[in-house]
A protein has these predicted regions:
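Conserved cytosolic headpiece of P-type ATPases
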Residues: 1-707, 717-718, 731, 745-746, ...
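Long hydrophobic segments that form regular secondary structure
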Residues: 741-750
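Generic alpha-helical transmembrane segments
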Residues: 688, 733-734, 756-770
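Membrane-water interface at loop-to-transmembrane-helix junctions
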Residues: 712-731, 751-757
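A C-terminal functional module that forms or caps the active site or interfaces directly
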Residues: 773
Length: 853
């Protein structure tokens, strides 16, 4: 049984029973996704216009509209397909895993591959992957509220269950979807997929959240307002043209086409694509985003609460010091005292302490392979191995009876083993938790009373080790149920990551407060914080000190502190709320099952990918696959970048749409001929709205992105003069297009040549404007134009389509264009270039006024 299934048997059962998954919602097929592009309201209007054209015999217009609709549908399909593929990759990466024994070897596999009969291992923080009967259990308890609605922890035991009346209340069964709160166990899978209790009573899908983000909803609302205004403008254009004597059909088509060209119907979709691309970019940098809305929120983060171990530090623990009552030892390749190698047999307390390292652990290490388990426990295991101890020999000689796994609340771990015909208990944990339990001390070869002077010496040793930035653990043992006998201390080095130091400096420049949270000793935390460059005159607070403050007092003084030591998960929750009371947007890291409430309460919950439990990962908005603070800071930078990029392409789309509306409306009101024909407006929409806007959403962060304070979440989207710039630029585009049209007529051009001149001016001015939108703080002439090859490619493709429409005889017939003479191309060039020059002049005037203030 303890060998588990063979790989072949597991494959056979997987074929027979299917994957360990609940029924999924049907995925969008490519054909259905493509046809879905035609359900858009704007497309419906275009198709209606096509029918009108056919009925009136305008076949050229009808075919042109259909071709453009098809092209738009293809572009929309490609964008949606790429977005769906990105989100599918995200779903696969967040799929749970399980520790399973196959062919006698423990391995980690996708939970979907589990089958009946598999032997699985469960530990605190795991999400149970399938219904399973406990084979062994050590202090295990589960949260089954997802099935029963009862939030109280349910203790579980291995062995046969006598009461079988209620399938959901069996003490020897753990159920798929429930969370292990404490303890550890091995269990045999008895049901998978839809045959589990979860599968029978629920069709809930554990899927990536893809609902609309707040920004998407705001922009969708904006789109509706703009659409309403455009419809009013279209009605005005229609009646003004008819009143002037233009053909009703022509004006009807013109009005409809203005609506199609001017209404930013693709705005929410473009935001979704930009967010999905940002998520994909973050994944490549080890930041896995669970929820799209967190991408926006990350950009507003003003406080990063980071765990010390593994996030700020390397999480590569190395035991450097061992202290017993009579001696202090250093550890490198062996155990040394004053530089000379020593044998543990010479020091009974040291030998017993190393036995505790070998037995009071859940870590495993096979020589020649990487150790498996918590970094702290593996460090202790390796230290004992350096002294000649073997984990396997110790387990065989002293069989395990019972284990109380490490708990973040109690900060200690305890095991009971058979020891020379009797029972012995080993204890390890935080010094301030272990020392008060002990009444005796192993001093040399004798057990003596742990006097107050001895206690003071131990506390002094803890202080000394902590001031060297070492993580300190204490060890004790007792025979049967006797008194606890203190053994000694270990000091472990876990230095700050170089990348974390740089990340903290970046946060300081970005006006983001970085706070270190740890369960370690206050002195250790302060030493690490000093090395990492975190303090800057701020102080440290312990969990005990935090408990003496009310919520109001904590919020009032919290800005004075950069380090919180000896804290538990409940303290984390209070810290999140205290920072939120100050108005800050809080990102909180966590890895344990008890961290889930704080992760959910934080504006951005961040779980650890390596050391994090499944419960923490599912509660989090973001998962750091490398447990690295610099990855979180990169995610914050990307959050700022994506918001800036969304502002950029909204600025681009709206100013272009305003330019098109101004061109058509002013032309009609000024008594000019219709400036652009419906097919020409559709061409404008095709070449300027799609690819350039998407490419603008792929801009890299601006150099000063992390030298600005975080954005306030309640800040209006059009703050900072964005709306004024959009309207002004739209007016410039419209006026210059009208000017080009008028100049072409004055130079003796035909109406078709004037319209072609206006068409080229309108499109080229918009393609130039896309480069202006790369920055809100620099004019076009001070921007790096070549650092986004996708934008360059999009503009090149759009310009190529325009020139083809002007030069190609077949396209000339479709879009009613004519080749332009050199004077008219000069008009196009001057009109298109005048717009960014005017914008740059206005930008300089505005910047000068701001400087004077």
């Amino acid at each position: 049984m303890m060998q588990g299934l063979t790989q072949q048997e597991a494959k056979n059962r997987l074929r027979q029973d299917g994957k360990n998954e609940l029924a999924e919602a049907p995925k969008s097929k490519p054909v259905r996704m493509f046809l879905g592009q035609f359900r858009d309201v704007m497309v419906m209007i275009l198709l209606a216009a096509t029918m009108v054209s056919v009925l009136l015999g305008e076949w050229t217009d009808a075919i042109t509209i259909i071709l453009i609709v098809l092209l738009n549908a293809i572009l929309g399909f490609i964008q949606e397909f790429r977005t769906e593929r990105t989100l599918e990759t995200l779903r696969q990466m967040t799929a749970p895993t399980a520790a399973v024994c196959r062919d006698g070897t423990w391995q980690t596999i996708s939970a979907a591959e589990l089958v009946r009969g598999d032997l699985i291992r469960l530990e605190a923080g795991d999400r149970v992957p399938a219904d399973a009967a406990l084979v062994t259990a050590s202090g295990i308890a589960a949260n089954e509220s997802i099935l029963t609605g009862e939030s109280a922890a349910v203790s579980k035991t291995a062995g046969a269950e006598t009461d079988t009346d209620n399938a959901l209340h069996k003490k020897n069964i753990v159920y798929a979807g429930t969370a292990i709160l404490r303890g550890s166990a091995t269990a045999c899978v008895i049901a998978t997929g839809t045959k589990t209790q979860m599968g029978q009573i629920s069709d809930l899908l554990h899927d990536v959240t893809v609902s609309q983000t707040p920004l998407q909803k705001r922009l969708a609302g904006l789109g509706k307002v703009v659409a309403l205004l455009c419809i009013v403008v279209c009605i005005l254009v229609f009646f003004a043209g008819v009143f002037r004597g233009e053909p009703i059909f022509d004006m009807l088509m013109t009005g409809i086409t203005i609506a199609i060209a001017a209404i930013p119907e693709g705005l929410p979709a473009t935001v979704t694509i930009a967010l999905a691309l940002a998520v994909s970019r973050m994944m490549k940098h080890q930041a896995l985003v669970n929820r799209l809305h967190s991408v926006e929120t990350l950009g507003c983060a003003g406080v990063l609460c980071a765990d010390k171990t593994g996030t700020i530090t390397e999480n590569d623990m190395t035991v450097t010091d061992l202290v017993i009552s009579t001696a202090h030892f250093s550890v490198d390749q062996c155990i040394r005292q004053q530089g000379a190698a020593v044998s543990p047999e010479q020091h009974p307390a040291l030998q017993t302490l190393l036995e505790c390292c070998m037995l009071c652990t859940t870590a495993e290490h096979t020589p020649g392979q990487n150790p498996i388990g918590d970094p702290t426990e593996t460090a202790l295991l390796i230290a004992a191995e350096k002294a000649g101890f073997s984990r396997e020999r110790c387990k065989q000689r002293y069989p395990l009876h019972h284990m109380e796994p490490f708990d973040s609340e109690t900060k200690k771990m305890e095991v009971t083993v058979s020891y020379n015909g009797t029972e012995r208990q080993y204890l390890k944990g935080a010094a301030d938790r272990v020392l008060p339990l002990c009444t005796q001390l192993l001093h040399g070869t004798t057990v003596t009373t742990l006097t107050e002077s001895f206690r003071e010496e131990i506390r002094s040793a803890v202080q000394t080790l902590s001031e060297r930035a070492l993580r300190v653990l204490a060890f004790a043992y007792r025979e049967s149920d006797g008194d606890w006998i203190f053994l000694g201390l270990s000091g472990m080095l876990d230095p700050p990551r170089e990348s974390a130091k740089q990340a903290i400096r970046t946060c300081e420049q970005a006006k983001i407060q970085t706070v270190m949270i740890t369960g370690d000793h206050k002195k250790t935390a302060l030493a690490i914080a000093e090395q990492a460059g975190l303090l800057h005159g701020k102080k440290a607070m312990t969990g005990q000190e935090l408990d003496t403050l009310s919520d109001e007092q904590l919020a009032a003084c919290i800005q004075e502190y950069a380090v919180f030591a000896r804290v538990n998960p409940a303290h984390k929750l209070r810290l999140v709320r205290a920072y939120q009371k100050t108005g800050a947007i809080v990102a909180m890291t966590g890895d344990g099952v008890n961290d889930a409430p704080a992760l959910k309460e934080a504006d951005v919950g961040v779980a650890m990918g390596k050391s994090g439990t499944e419960v923490a990962k599912q509660a989090a908005d973001v998962i750091l696959l490398d447990d690295n603070l610099s990855t979180l800071v990169y995610a914050v930078e990307q959050g700022r970048c994506i918001y800036a990029n969304i502002r950029k392409f909204v600025r681009y789309l709206l100013s272009c749409n305003i330019g098109e509306v101004i061109t058509m409306l002013l032309g009609i009101l000024m008594g000019m001929p219709v400036i652009l024909l419906p097919t020409q407006l559709l061409l404008v929409n095709l070449v300027t709205d799609g690819l350039p806007a998407i490419a603008l959403g792929m801009e890299q962060p601006e150099p000063d992105a992390m030298r600005q304070p975080p954005r306030k979440p309640e800040e209006p989207f059009f703050s900072g003069g964005l709306l004024q710039r959009i309207v002004f630029r739209g007016l410039l585009i419209g006026v210059c297009t009208l000017g080009a049209f008028s100049m072409a007529l004055r130079l003796g051009g035909t109406l078709e040549a004037a319209r072609t001149t206006a068409l080229c001016t309108l499109i080229l001015s918009q393609l130039i404007h896309v480069f202006e939108c790369k920055s809100e703080t620099k004019s076009l002439f001070h921007l790096p134009l070549w650092n986004n090859w996708k934008l360059l490619a999009a503009v090149a493709v759009s310009a190529g389509i325009l020139f083809a429409a002007v030069k190609n005889s077949a396209l000339q017939l479709i879009f009613t264009t004519v080749p332009l003479s050199l004077p008219l191309w000069i008009v196009v060039a001057i009109s298109s270039c005048a717009i960014p020059i005017c914008s740059a002049i206005l930008f300089q005037i505005t910047a000068k006024k701001k400087g004077e203030r």
